[in-house]
């Protein structure tokens, strides 16, 4: 019987152990997509307690707690921090088999140093007190944890109207060497069907000093904000393409669509597709000219529980996987961006694992001369960010593309404790390659495979995003 979560956790061959301990373990972290609040990094936020750093805002944990019958007041409601933590501690023993069980104990181990102890009601007091004592120390502040975890770069997720003042404050502090750069997330600027669109256009017009009436005005406003983001070091965009649409339109049609929407009219699905296509093609060309990377996160079915959405708002754990076809529309969109050789470096993520092979083969259609891995099939995302999901994504990437050119893992997280997801990924990567070697499916060449592992863990992302590190 193998003990739980030793130093060789998941490393079930000797070759995997060598790969992890000698090549993967000590690689820095290049976390190119996350949802950390830049204000907390700028202020070097000190966490009040374990709930504050670990459970607050974590919809993964809330989903598990609800499934365990926990009352909503103990998830997102007015219960005390300690009551919410105790509810989580009571849920954890029921999460065996869920990635939350592994994540929980990896996060207790690093950075808190808690080993050989499982979170449960019987250990809740001890773990709560031990972690809170550590959180009072200087090296457990927001910046302190990032430094402990050997982070070199993080890309936050930011709206085009954001001032980026916190990024500027961080950049001016020469004592803090981790790059904290904004990522451009313009969903509100092209989700024309949303009820909030008109209000957003007014805000975008205000910050860009542009009166948005025609499509060209929107392009002008977005270009000004792209320049603002570029001035703060941005090299990455991110798009939530819950549904992939494609329909072409001329400028007069786009002007009419925008004008009628700003006048309060409801648009047809075809008109929505025309508008979204035009914005994405325009933005893709801007990214290509600037050398940015675009990310497409495809296939979420959001806000399914309307009663809870009205009570609690979005992003609180009521989203799931969509099953709408997207191959043909995505192909047309990428091909349109590529017509004038203005398709930027692109990472494609799917939420439905059924679409893994779709994206794995789609990325091969648009690779770029002289640019290894220009089109990336991205890491297992959200519900696929677990052992089976990561294994499937990497296996299919290896079979349909080049695993050796993969830009690797990202946290996609709102928590400063989520950096151990990079460790989890690295262990799974080394386990997978070690098994290939054990089965005679890959050569037992530690130098060849060790360099490949180092590249996937850090070097490929550093080179792909072309961000100068400190």
Curated annotation (Swiss-Prot):
Keywords: Isomerase. Its EC number is 5.3.1.12. It catalyses: D-glucuronate = D-fructuronate; aldehydo-D-galacturonate = keto-D-tagaturonate. It is an enzyme of class 5 (isomerase). Pfam families: UxaC. GO terms for biological process: D-galacturonate catabolic process; D-glucuronate catabolic process. The keyword Isomerase applies. Pathway: Carbohydrate metabolism; pentose and glucuronate interconversion. One of its GO terms (molecular function) is glucuronate isomerase activity. The keyword S-adenosyl-L-methionine does not apply. InterPro entries: Metal_Hydrolase (IPR032466), Uronate_isomerase (IPR003766). SUPFAM superfamilies: Metallo-dependent hydrolases (SSF51556). PANTHER family: URONATE ISOMERASE (PTHR30068:SF4). Belongs to the metallo-dependent hydrolases superfamily. Uronate isomerase family. This is Uronate isomerase. It comes from Escherichia coli O157:H7.
């Amino acid at each position: 019987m193998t003990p739980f979560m030793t130093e060789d956790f998941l490393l079930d061959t000797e070759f995997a152990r060598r790969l992890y301990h000698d090549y993967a373990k000590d690689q820095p972290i290049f976390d190119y997509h996350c949802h950390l609040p830049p204000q907390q990094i700028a202020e070097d936020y000190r966490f009040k307690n374990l709930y504050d750093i670990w459970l607050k805002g974590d919809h993964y944990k809330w989903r598990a707690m609800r499934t365990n019958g926990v009352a909503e007041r103990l998830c997102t409601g007015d219960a005390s921090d300690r009551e919410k933590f105790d509810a989580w501690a009571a849920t954890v023993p029921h999460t065996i088999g869920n990635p939350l069980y592994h994540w929980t104990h990896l996060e207790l181990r690093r950075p808190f140093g808690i080993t050989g102890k499982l979170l449960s009601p019987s250990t809740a007091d001890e773990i709560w007190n031990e972690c809170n004592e550590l959180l009072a120390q200087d090296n457990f502040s927001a910046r302190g944890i990032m430094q402990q975890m050997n982070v070199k770069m993080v890309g936050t997720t930011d709206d085009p109207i954001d001032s980026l003042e916190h990024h500027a404050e961080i950049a001016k502090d020469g004592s803090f060497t981790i790059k904290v750069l904004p990522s451009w997330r313009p969903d509100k600027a092209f989700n024309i069907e949303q009820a909030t669109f008109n209000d957003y256009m007014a805000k975008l017009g205000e910050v860009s000093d542009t009166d948005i009436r025609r499509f060209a005005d929107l392009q002008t406003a977005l270009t000004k904000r792209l320049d603002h983001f570029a001035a703060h070091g941005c090299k990455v965009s991110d798009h939530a393409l819950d549904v992939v649409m494609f329909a072409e339109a001329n400028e007069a049609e786009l002007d009419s669509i925008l004008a009628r929407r700003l006048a309060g009219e409801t648009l047809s699905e075809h008109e929505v597709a025309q508008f979204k296509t035009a914005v994405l093609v325009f933005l893709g060309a801007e990214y290509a000219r600037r050398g940015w990377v675009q990310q497409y996160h495809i296939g979420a079915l959001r806000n399914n529980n309307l009663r809870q959405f009205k009570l609690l708002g979005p992003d609180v754990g009521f989203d799931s996987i969509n099953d709408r076809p997207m191959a043909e529309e995505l192909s047309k969109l990428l091909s349109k961006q590529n017509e004038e050789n203005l398709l930027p470096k692109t990472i494609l993520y799917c939420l439905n694992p059924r679409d893994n092979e779709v994206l794995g083969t789609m990325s091969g259609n648009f690779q770029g001369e002289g640019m290894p891995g220009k089109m990336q099939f991205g890491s297992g995302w959200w519900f696929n960010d677990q052992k089976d999901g990561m294994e499937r994504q990497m296996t299919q990437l290896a079979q349909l593309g080049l695993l050796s050119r993969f830009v690797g893992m990202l946290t996609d997280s709102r928590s400063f404790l989520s950096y151990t997801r990079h460790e989890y990924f690295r262990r799974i990567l080394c386990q997978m390659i070690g098994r290939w070697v054990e089965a005679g499916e890959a050569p037992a060449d530690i130098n060849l495979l060790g360099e490949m592992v180092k590249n996937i863990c850090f070097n490929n992302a550093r080179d792909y995003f072309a961000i100068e590190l400190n």
